[in-house]
Amino acid sequence: MDQRFVPRQQALPVRVRIPALELVAPVDPLELTDEGRLAAPDSANRTGWWRAGPEPGEQGPAVIAGHVDSRNGPAVFYELDTLSPGNRVFVDRADGSTAVFRTYRSERHAKSDFPTNRVYAETAAPELRLITCGGVFDDRSGDYLDNVIVFAVRVR
């Protein structure tokens, strides 16, 4: 195993920074809903990390989600779909360290066809998934029909 990526104790994520979006946001722990979906963060201006998965920077795919908008306007991941391959994502952790990731792909999928295996399956290196809603808003369900998923790999 590459020693640069050995997990640290108590390296829980506390803040995500995406310079290309001028984004700095706190990170809260998230659980799965009774339906088995990742719960959304409580606040439109905060992100959430799936606490049952890897901590950002550990082996495997860490997942951080955020809202695209709210009744009051744009939310924390409003511009997530504008990220390009090569953009940097910094995850500041409770132990004072920062895990740095480089984006390599962005996808949009219908929520009914969410790529669960590609998002949550084990990876060869520490990776990060950033997820928000996208596509058309369905007034009847009160939700967007798609998800935007950004894939990133740890570089430092």
Indicate residue ranges for each PLM-predicted region.
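Solvent-exposed, non-transmembrane regions of membrane-associated and secreted proteins
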Residues: 1-84, 92-97, 104-156
